[in-house]
């Protein structure tokens, strides 16, 4: 009788254990915290030289066999494909599948890939690992799986929604960006991906982050749609003190645009993944910072408490603004970060790096807290990242936003109607918005403007724009020293009512 009771209790315990087992971010956090208490071990490359030294064109020949997509034989709408190691993607990452009862390592096999003309010894690749992975989902049509997430290299990941193409990237963490000591790039060293059910519309991914001075545990919940939203939870532990911690970092590219035209003739009027930094400050102010490709490294810091959101946006999606049939910059998404909870005091920081071509990501934006805990203490950050082409929906409906910033030679119209340059620089800024379009065109809209010590506002005028049903600000400024940057701000008002976001522009140094 006692034996039967013991067996019954054992069976009940087994049933309870199996039904209540669940993998969570806490499992990853235990590993991250343990790593933080140990010395950093740099990842070791196991890559044969034929792959490590290959050119990009050769790396592109290594393709995943779509017929062997992970979960291909399951009814789940999500599928996984993997990246092969090659070039600077020379260290493997571990990838695991999480099911209802267990964690299973997804093992590398060269049979997953076709290698094109890349000559290699099959025995030398049989024990390699994956460089990263991608997620496929029928986001554009029910009968076709399209790539919606790519996790490859350091802590970078790219995400798109319906009708979008890859553009800017997000990252897990940034350390010492733009500091003289040099930037440290943490990397995701291991992933755990939950096997979704047939009816699931979201995919959960966990990641373990490691670097010389920080570790972290991450949970990403990917929700694909017209806008693909990624819900992020992170637990970060410092191994050692850092100069600057970048939370929810975004990385993009800006080469040229109307505010900074191409120095050489180019059939493309604009070339960028993003054209501005948008900030919703803790005090409710909306700020728009047009991007530059400066001649020298530029860092802009916007101090605040408890930010409500920030993002790198691609405003203005008419194909005629880009004219690029190959790279389709008009279809590249904006990324908007919405913090959850109070993030305290800190700054949204924008880093602009000089670049000569579009292959370099030269724009970085992130939140950096004023106070960091001692090494080993846990930091928690929760936020969502929305990848969207509907930039107006990322903005308050009752607040007008900057549709376009154009830079021109300043001039004055003479009595003979000929425009004569007067040594100034003109900025033409168009504001628009749902509520602004409802205003009568004779509304007495004016501009509140200011400029830093290195400049003088010669004239500013505001007039109704019947084409956009918004208002256009024209501001002519005189720069005192072209070797220095010049800061300026402007916002539209009607008496004591603020109508628009704040246009916050930095004119780069000319040399």
Curated annotation (Swiss-Prot):
<dbReference type="GO" id="GO:0030246">
    <property type="term" value="F:carbohydrate binding"/>
</dbReference>
<feature type="signal peptide">
    <location>
        <begin position="1"/>
        <end position="22"/>
    </location>
</feature>
<protein>
    <recommendedName>
        <fullName>Glucans biosynthesis protein G</fullName>
    </recommendedName>
</protein>
<comment type="similarity">
    <text>Belongs to the OpgD/OpgG family.</text>
</comment>
<dbReference type="Pfam" id="PF04349">
    <property type="entry name" value="MdoG"/>
</dbReference>
<comment type="function">
    <text>Involved in the biosynthesis of osmoregulated periplasmic glucans (OPGs).</text>
</comment>
<comment type="pathway">
    <text>Glycan metabolism; osmoregulated periplasmic glucan (OPG) biosynthesis.</text>
</comment>
<dbReference type="GO" id="GO:0051274">
    <property type="term" value="P:beta-glucan biosynthetic process"/>
</dbReference>
<dbReference type="InterPro" id="IPR014438">
    <property type="entry name" value="Glucan_biosyn_MdoG/MdoD"/>
</dbReference>
<dbReference type="InterPro" id="IPR007444">
    <property type="entry name" value="Glucan_biosyn_MdoG_C"/>
</dbReference>
<dbReference type="GO" id="GO:0003824">
    <property type="term" value="F:catalytic activity"/>
</dbReference>
<keyword id="KW-0732">Signal</keyword>
<dbReference type="InterPro" id="IPR013783">
    <property type="entry name" value="Ig-like_fold"/>
</dbReference>
<dbReference type="InterPro" id="IPR014756">
    <property type="entry name" value="Ig_E-set"/>
</dbReference>
<dbReference type="InterPro" id="IPR011013">
    <property type="entry name" value="Gal_mutarotase_sf_dom"/>
</dbReference>
<dbReference type="InterPro" id="IPR014718">
    <property type="entry name" value="GH-type_carb-bd"/>
</dbReference>
<keyword id="KW-0574">Periplasm</keyword>
<dbReference type="GO" id="GO:0030288">
    <property type="term" value="C:outer membrane-bounded periplasmic space"/>
</dbReference>
<dbReference type="InterPro" id="IPR023704">
    <property type="entry name" value="MdoG_OpgG"/>
</dbReference>
């Amino acid at each position: 009788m006692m034996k039967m009771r013991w067996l019954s209790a054992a069976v009940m315990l087994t049933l309870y254990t199996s039904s209540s087992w669940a993998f969570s971010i806490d499992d990853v956090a235990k590993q991250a915290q343990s790593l933080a208490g140990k010395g950093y071990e740099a990842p070791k490359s196991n890559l044969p030289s034929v792959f490590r030294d290959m050119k990009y064109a050769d790396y592109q020949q290594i393709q995943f066999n779509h017929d062997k997509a992970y979960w291909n034989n399951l009814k789940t709408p999500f599928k996984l494909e993997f990246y092969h190691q090659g070039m600077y993607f020379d260290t493997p990452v571990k990838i695991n599948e999480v099911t209802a009862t267990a964690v299973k390592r997804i093992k590398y096999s060269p049979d997953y890939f076709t290698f094109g003309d890349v000559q290699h010894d099959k025995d030398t690749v049989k024990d390699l690992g994956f460089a990263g992975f991608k997620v496929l989902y029928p986001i554009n049509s029910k009968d076709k799986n399209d790539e919606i997430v790519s996790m490859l290299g350091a802590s970078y990941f790219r995400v798109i929604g319906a009708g979008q193409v890859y553009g800017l990237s997000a990252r897990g963490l940034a350390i010492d960006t733009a500091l003289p000591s040099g930037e440290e790039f943490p990397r995701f060293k291991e992933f755990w991906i939950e096997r979704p059910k047939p009816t699931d519309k979201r995919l959960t991914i966990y990641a373990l982050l490691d670097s010389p001075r920080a570790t972290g545990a991450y949970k990403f919940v990917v929700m694909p749609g017209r806008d693909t939203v990624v819900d992020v939870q992170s637990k970060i532990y410092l191994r050692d003190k850092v100069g600057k911690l970048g939370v929810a970092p975004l990385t993009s590219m800006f080469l040229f645009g109307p505010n900074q035209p191409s120095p050489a003739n180019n059939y493309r009027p604009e070339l960028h993944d993003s054209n501005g930094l948008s900030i919703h400050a803790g005090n409710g102010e909306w700020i728009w910072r047009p991007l530059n490709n400066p001649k020298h490294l530029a860092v802009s810091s916007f101090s605040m408490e408890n930010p409500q959101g920030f993002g790198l946006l691609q405003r203005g999606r008419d194909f005629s603004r880009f004219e690029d049939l190959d790279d389709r910059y008009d279809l590249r998404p904006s990324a908007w970060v919405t913090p959850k909870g109070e993030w305290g005091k800190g700054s949204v920081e924008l880093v602009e790096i000089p670049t000569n071509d579009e292959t370099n990501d030269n724009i970085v934006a992130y939140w950096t807290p004023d106070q960091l805990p001692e090494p080993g203490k846990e930091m928690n950050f929760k936020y969502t990242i929305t990848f969207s082409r509907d930039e107006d929906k990322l903005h308050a409906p009752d607040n007008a936003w900057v549709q376009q910033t154009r830079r021109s030679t300043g001039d004055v119209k003479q009595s003979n109607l000929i425009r004569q340059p007067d040594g100034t620089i003109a900025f033409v800024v168009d504001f628009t918005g749902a509520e602004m379009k409802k205003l009568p065109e004779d509304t007495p809209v004016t501009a509140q403007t200011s400029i830093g010590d290195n400049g003088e506002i010669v004239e500013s005028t505001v007039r109704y724009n019947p084409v956009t049903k918004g208002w256009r600000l024209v501001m002519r400024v005189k720069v005192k020293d072209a070797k220095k940057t010049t800061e300026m701000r402007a916002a539209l008002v009607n008496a004591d009512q603020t109508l628009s976001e704040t246009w916050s522009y930095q004119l780069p140094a000319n040399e």
